[in-house]
Amino acid sequence: KEGYPVGRDGCKISCVINNNFCKVECQAKWRQSDGYCYFWGLSCYCTNLPEDAQVWDSSTNKCGG
C-alpha cells in the first residue's frame, strides 16, 4: 500500500523537494516504509505501507475543519 501520510490536523504533510524529511515522517509512523516528497502535490508520499495504514483519502478528507 502507499499514500499520503496525515498530520495531526488531518491534512497531508507538506514538503518542498525534501525527500529525507518525508522518509523520516513515513518511517516514524510505519517503520518499514519509505517516503519521498511528491513534487506536484508538495506533500510527503509514503510507500511500502501495511494494508491497515491510515493515509489521506479525498472522500474522508478532514483537513482544515
From Swiss-Prot:
One of its GO terms (cellular component) is extracellular region. Expressed by the venom gland. Signal peptide: none annotated. It comes from the Eukaryota. One of its GO terms (molecular function) is sodium channel inhibitor activity. Residues 1-64 form the LCN-type CS-alpha/beta domain. GO terms for biological process: defense response. Its main location: secreted. Keywords: Disulfide bond, Ion channel impairing toxin, Neurotoxin, Secreted, Toxin, Voltage-gated sodium channel impairing toxin. Disulfide bonds join C11-C63, C15-C37, C22-C44, C26-C46. It is found in: Secreted. Beta toxins bind voltage-independently at site-4 of sodium channels (Nav) and shift the voltage of activation toward more negative potentials thereby affecting sodium channel activation and promoting spontaneous and repetitive firing. Belongs to the long (4 C-C) scorpion toxin superfamily. Sodium channel inhibitor family. Beta subfamily. Has the structural arrangement of an alpha-helix connected to antiparallel beta-sheets by disulfide bonds (CS-alpha/beta). This is Putative beta-neurotoxin RjAa12.
